[in-house]
Amino acid sequence: MMQELKILNEKRAEIYWWLSSLFFKELSEQDIARYHSAEVRTFLSGLADEQSLNREVKHLVEALNRLQNRQDAQLELAADFCDLFLKSDRDSALPYASVYTDKGLLNGKPAQQMRELLGAHGVKVEQNLNEPEDHLAIQLDFLAHLAISANQIEHSAQLSSALQAQSDFISQHLLTWLPAFAERCTQFDAFGLYSAAARLALAFIQQDKHCLDELFQETH
């Protein structure tokens, strides 16, 4: 079981890192080209094999297909990113937990909690990401770190604790605000790529928590 769990954790980390990259910065021309490659389309097809993710992956692929016919695709998609994630909160979907859980204020209690968690795990935020620690990209990257770190554990008691910690992080730091974030993305993202990405992130995180809870019961 330990070997199977290590493979699963590597796949989970890969998906979390990928999701993090979508909200980290605007996609470049090279990034967009990769999204049209056979390798990435195969990766997305694999995700779609999960019934709970099928609809959201389908919406993301449809948006990527529309992107191929969008004039000035990179510039327009960068404008979508800016309008959604970098402007004022009134007509946007700011990707910070504090905005949704702490009176709409930036850099609130969730950011402080994330700073403490990152410090406790020795995780440093990438220097060129000048953002509060409760940014969605940072939280997703941290989950990837937790998944990979669990692969260093050899004792079942410690493994159970690591699985519980990941499930708790999802409950306490993501599911408290991600549904509202995804809803705002859907409301304000006219083209639909980032709203599809947000809904897919939510669906995957919900599925992952269910999986973690089942694994915890098996190892506890």
Curated annotation (Swiss-Prot):
Which UniProt keywords are listed?
Chaperone, Cytoplasm
Q: Which InterPro entries match?
A: Chaperone_TorD, DMSO/NO3_reduct_chaperone, HscB_C_sf, TorD-like_sf, TorD/DmsD_chaperones
Question: Is Thylakoid there in the keyword field?
Answer: no
Q: Which domain of life is it from?
A: Bacteria
Indicate the principal place this protein occupies in or around the cell: cytoplasm
Similarity comment: family membership: Belongs to the TorD/DmsD family. TorD subfamily.
Instruction: Output this protein's name.
Output: Chaperone protein TorD
Upper taxonomic lineage: Bacteria, Pseudomonadati, Pseudomonadota, Gammaproteobacteria, Vibrionales
